[in-house]
UniProtKB/Swiss-Prot annotation:
Official protein name in the record: RING finger protein 207
UniProt feature, compositional bias: Polar residues: 562-575
InterPro entries given in the database record: RNF207, Znf_B-box, Znf_C3HC4_RING-type, Znf_RING, Znf_RING/FYVE/PHD, Znf_RING_CS
Role played: Plays a role in cardiac repolarization possibly by stabilizing membrane expression of the potassium channel KCNH2/HERG, or by assisting its synthesis, folding or export from the endoplasmic reticulum, in a heat shock protein-dependent manner.
Zn finger residue spans: B box-type: 93-145
Subunit composition and interactions: Interacts with the core-glycosylated, but not the fully glycosylated form of KCNH2/HERG. Interacts with DNAJA1 and HSPA8. Interacts (via the C-terminus) with HSPA1A; this interaction additively increases KCNH2 expression.
PANTHER family per UniProt: RING FINGER PROTEIN 207
Zinc fingers (RING-type), renumbered ranges: 25-64
Gene behind the chain: RNF207
Organism in which the protein naturally occurs: Oryctolagus cuniculus
GO biological process: regulation of cardiac muscle contraction; regulation of heart looping
GO CC terms: perinuclear region of cytoplasm
Amino acid sequence: MSGAIFAPLEGPGALDAASGHPLVCPLCHAQYERPCLLDCFHDFCAGCLRGRTADGRVACPLCQHQTVVKGPSGLPPVDRLLQFLVDSSGDGVEAVHCANCDLDCSKQDAETACFCNTCGQPLCARCRDETHRARMFARHDIVALGQRSRDVLQKCPLHAEPYLMFSTDKKSLLCIRCFRDLQGESRAHCVDLESAYVQGCERLEQAVLAVKALQAATREAIALLQAMVEEVRRSAEEEAAAIHALFDSVQEKLAERKALLLQAVQSQYEEKDQAFKEQLSHLATLLPTLQIHLVICSSFLSLANKAEFLDLGYELMERLQGVVTRPHRLRPAQSSKIASDYRAEFARCLEPLLLLGPRRATGAQGGANTLAGGSGPKVLMGPSCPSPVRKVSRSPVQKPTLPRSISTKVLLADGEDTPFAEHCRHYEDSYRGLQAEVQNLKDQVQELHRDLTKHHSLIRAEIMADILHRSLRLDAQIDSEYASVEGMRAVFQEIWEESYQRLAGEQEIYEAQLRDLFQLKQENAHLTTITKHITPYVRSIAKVKERLEPRFQASADDESENPQTAYDASRNGETPASLLLPGSVASAEPPFVN
């Protein structure tokens, strides 16, 4: 069964309305019929609880507390107190039969009916005047019908004697015969009904005061919790608004920096693309010129005789030398890598918003939250993904933050005379003094608390006033030291900024060195590929020369065995001898190497 019977409280004023009538069942909303009391002190009608028992337990429909039930009925015991209140209430008045006229009185007559305690009979208003008019009935005790249960002495069901005593030990009423049956020790706990009534009223008053105090504390707790619920809602709204505002600001900053970075990348791309295309166009016009001169050289060697060779050969050699010695931009003037340092740029644009310095993982705000006792914001640090372009570089690994004492000792052990080291020395002295005073106060307060709780010793007010005064003075000293340390932030921030710029410059130079070495490696691989492509043609020309001029066989063998020598000679501007040999085939041309 659901326990949602009462509506949620809307405010402190709804507490009284939510309590309901004490004689009305909260389930059926009618007057109790055989009210049953649960262990949680909630009452319900026996009919309302019937059928709710499971495994010998019944769950309270209001608070869901489990109550163990015993007996074949499967119901909790009847609440005798609440049943008495129900029977004594106005709604529980039974039909009245007058002892004189034996007629049922109407509801209006029942309200004016009386009861003669002396006769022990109910009387209607008319019969009371008729039967008790004589002087002999003047001493009869006549009360209202509703007061009869309070004033009439009840009788013992065992001995049919009126109750005269009350046992404070067994909490039971006793007649004279019950009193005689008790032992001597038990009789000492028996008092008359009037005294027992007075004592019971006093104890009941004390219990009522305790319940009222608990009621007042409960109302205050409810008011406090309702205020905290409102405060939590308001705090959640403020936090959500701050998150949205920060997120929007971060998006705006990132979008602006993204546009600038993309613009810078596009500018670098256009610049490098234009430079490479211009150089490629120059080399594209140079390659046919070289091809033509090689064909001219081969044709000249095959067609010219010795006289023609000596007449025009040196002119051809000068032309070839001029072609080779002209400045040609064979090496790329720029690298093909476009670097925008986007990670550092994004971090730099987010630094003012997130209060994260480039040299510290968490800012001063996180430390302040930790000192204040708050949980502080939890920063989710994920593994940094390496850039697909910058494969050589790696993200710096964040070292775990050392405790303050250990890190300070390590810093002071280095022996460097820096402003921060001098500040740490001064801070350690001040901190140890403040820590010693706090520990002294703590020990003194703990000792006083132990004397007060365990030994119940009397503590003078002067001692407490002195401790309070020392605590306030120590608090002022801590505030002063905190302000002094906080005032050094600007000085150290400038020093840290200079160090960071120096480290950033060193990192940039280091990355440039790696890029230069990588570029040299690429150029060397390109030259190796070109050499492998030229080697077969060098060997072919050497074999042709060997067949035409046997005297050049030795030199041709040397050149075929060492093709790298011919390649180096061509790089130095010297014409290999194999290219000047007559009979070279014009079709033996080196491939186009791009």
